[in-house]
């Protein structure tokens, strides 16, 4: 059946987020993944994170008394070119769509920082200590900024405004809230299989969004883009009611115990005790299992943990087990578990 193409691939059962000393850096560990999927997912998520998340940035600046970026300002130590470079590093968060205008005024002596800018609405300066310029005694500066929302990197020549007033200087804009993304793929173990992938993604942002949300947005973008390629309807699964009308027990009991990926010792003990199906296993009590030759407490805990993941436990009663046509039923319901 076609759904086996994706249903029988192993899916991650562990997603762990970890924080760093820098609150803008976070990591996520995902495991286990099918071999090769760590590289596939890591590279796709990295590219989307760096290119496609929206943010806010300054697109143009007007400095009183300045006509172009190759000017200098009396009493200001930095020239306009250096000031513009510093302006490009201002990190902003703005939930509403732009453009918006913000203003800053400063008298010397002193340092003009990003936190001195008067914001409007829901706008927030994320690096208020960032230095824009340094003013000497009796120096004064007034700047007006245009802030907009977008994605990716936009060069200054694309931020030019038609019929803009003289002195409005366009600025390169880095809208992306993501500063850096790296990933690492390692081998991990699932049951007796040792060559699954473990993906570790590390995301550094400017503070406008946390790493966990950024990953969620990137995954949603990929999901939306890939949906175009799905040219079929999801095959219908038999409902629980339909299954129960034909079976007097959970279809998962028809699964063979050698598919549970138990340790070699546990699997051999079950085999030696003629336990073939999960339905055979769950009717055993803990004391009965411990009386099995070479079967110890460690194997018991392993089996209890596996059964718990399936919503089952030892010592269950199934009056209609085993069914007469158990082999035929096992083949019929194999896609449901």
UniProtKB/Swiss-Prot annotation:
Under InterPro entries, the record lists: DNA-dir_RNA_pol_insert (IPR011262), DNA-dir_RNA_pol_RpoA/D/Rpb3 (IPR011263), DNA-dir_RpoA (IPR011773), RBP11-like (IPR036603), RNAP_asu_C (IPR011260), RNApol_insert_sf (IPR036643)
- Which BP terms in the Gene Ontology apply to this protein? DNA-templated transcription
Pfam (any one)? RNA_pol_A_CTD
Its EC number is 2.7.7.6
What catalytic activity does the UniProt entry give for this protein? RNA(n) + a ribonucleoside 5'-triphosphate = RNA(n+1) + diphosphate
Residues of the region (Alpha C-terminal domain (alpha-CTD)) are: 249-337
Assigned GO CC terms:
cytoplasm; DNA-directed RNA polymerase complex
Region annotated Alpha N-terminal domain (alpha-NTD), chain positions: 1-233
A GO MF term:
protein dimerization activity
Query: Which residues, if any, are the signal sequence?
Result: none
Subunit structure comment from the entry: Homodimer. The RNAP catalytic core consists of 2 alpha, 1 beta, 1 beta' and 1 omega subunit. When a sigma factor is associated with the core the holoenzyme is formed, which can initiate transcription.
* Described function: DNA-dependent RNA polymerase catalyzes the transcription of DNA into RNA using the four ribonucleoside triphosphates as substrates.
Family designation = Belongs to the RNA polymerase alpha chain family.
- Please report the name of this protein according to its UniProt entry: DNA-directed RNA polymerase subunit alpha
**What organism does the record attribute this protein to?**
Bartonella henselae (strain ATCC 49882 / DSM 28221 / CCUG 30454 / Houston 1) (Rochalimaea henselae)
Lineage from the top down? Bacteria, Pseudomonadati, Pseudomonadota, Alphaproteobacteria, Hyphomicrobiales
Gene behind this protein: rpoA
């Amino acid at each position: 059946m076609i759904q086996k193409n994706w249903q029988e691939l192993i899916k991650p059962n562990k997603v762990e987020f970890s924080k760093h000393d820098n609150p803008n850096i976070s990591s996520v560990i995902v495991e286990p993944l099918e071999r090769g999927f760590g590289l596939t997912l890591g590279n796709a998520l990295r590219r989307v994170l760096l290119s496609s998340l929206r943010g806010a940035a300054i697109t143009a600046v007007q400095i009183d008394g300045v006509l172009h970026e190759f000017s200098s300002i009396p009493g200001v130590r930095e020239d306009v070119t250096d000031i513009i470079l510093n302006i490009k590093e201002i990190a902003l968060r703005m939930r509403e769509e732009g453009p918006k205008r913000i203003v800053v005024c400063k008298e010397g002596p002193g340092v003009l920082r990003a936190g001195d800018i008067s914001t409007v609405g829901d706008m927030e300066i994320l690096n208020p200590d960032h230095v824009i310029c340094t003013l000497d005694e009796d120096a004064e500066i007034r700047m007006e900024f245009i802030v907009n929302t977008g994605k990716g990197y936009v060069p200054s020549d694309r931020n030019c405004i038609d019929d803009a007033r003289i002195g409005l200087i366009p600025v390169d804009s880095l809208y992306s809230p993501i500063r850096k993304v790296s990933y690492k793929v390692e081998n991990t173990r699932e049951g007796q299989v040792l060559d699954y992938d473990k993906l570790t993604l590390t995301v550094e942002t400017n503070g406008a969004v946390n790493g966990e949300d950024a990953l969620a947005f990137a995954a949603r973008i990929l999901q939306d883009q890939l949906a175009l390629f799905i040219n079929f309807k999801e095959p219908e699964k038999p409902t629980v009611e339909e299954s129960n009308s034909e079976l007097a027990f959970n279809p998962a009991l028809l699964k063979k115990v050698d598919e549970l990926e138990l340790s070699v010792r546990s699997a051999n003990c079950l085999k030696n005790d003629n336990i073939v199906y999960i339905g055979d296993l769950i009717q055993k009590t803990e004391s009965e299992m411990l009386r099995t030759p070479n079967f110890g407490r460690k194997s018991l805990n392993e089996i209890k943990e596996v059964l718990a993941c399936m919503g089952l436990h030892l010592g269950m009663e199934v009056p209609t087990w085993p069914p007469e046509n158990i082999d035929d039923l096992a083949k019929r319901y194999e896609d449901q578990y």
